[in-house]
Regions:
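Non-catalytic signal-transmission and effector/linker regions of two-component phosphorelay proteins
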Residues: 1-30, 43, 134-152
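Charged docking surfaces used in two-component/phosphorelay signaling
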Residues: 40-48
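Short hydrophobic/Thr-rich beta-strand motif most characteristic of the beta2 strand and flanking loop
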Residues: 50-58, 62-65
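Receiver (REC) domain active-site loop signature in two-component systems and cognate sites
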Residues: 80
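Hydrophobic/aromatic residues positioned on beta-strands within the core alpha/beta folds
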Residues: 104-106
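A Lys-centered signature of the CheY-like receiver
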Residues: 129
Length: 152
């Protein structure tokens, strides 16, 4: 995992904002993918790792769910019909009740341009698909551990 401002890295996971700012007061994670089976598989993985996780396949329900449930992290697919992950990230960043959440892009779109768009939209991290459980868990566990340790 890399933390820097670059979108040029060949790493499979990039983190652009220090994870400590997400402040995981709990281990709630919202997973969003229009492919329901993918969202549910990721949900099961995260639950097995001790996270409280909800999965959505409807991008139009994300902002309301995030405001109501207050997850510390939202994992978003980028390409979804009707409302893509980039626009969702912008909307979550624009709302005072969701602007602090850790936003993780999980997507097959991993070119330099794709990463730059994700960063500009407000994502904190980018995990390239095909996603292995370890990739996402590295980001989420780091965020949760940093909260337990307190701000650096």
């Amino acid at each position: 995992m890399t933390f820097n401002d670059s979108v040029d890295s060949n790493d499979d996971v990039l983190v652009w904002r220090p994870i400590r700012y997400a402040m995981a007061a709990h281990r709630r994670v919202l997973v969003v993918d229009d492919y329901r089976e993918a969202a549910e598989a990721l949900q099961m993985l995260l639950i097995a790792d001790g996270f409280d996780c909800r999965a959505l396949d409807d991008p139009f329900a994300v902002c309301d769910m995030a405001r109501e449930w207050q997850p510390f992290a939202v994992v978003l697919d980028i390409k979804m019909p009707g409302l893509d992950g980039l626009e969702l990230a912008r909307r979550l960043r624009a709302h005072s009740q969701t602007s602090h959440m850790l936003l993780v892009a999980c997507t097959a779109f991993a070119s330099r341009e794709d990463r730059a768009q994700a960063k500009a939209a407000g994502f904190d991290a980018h995990c390239a698909k095909p996603l292995t459980p370890e990739r996402l868990l590295r980001v989420l566990e780091s965020a949760a551990a940093l909260h337990v340790a307190g701000p650096l």
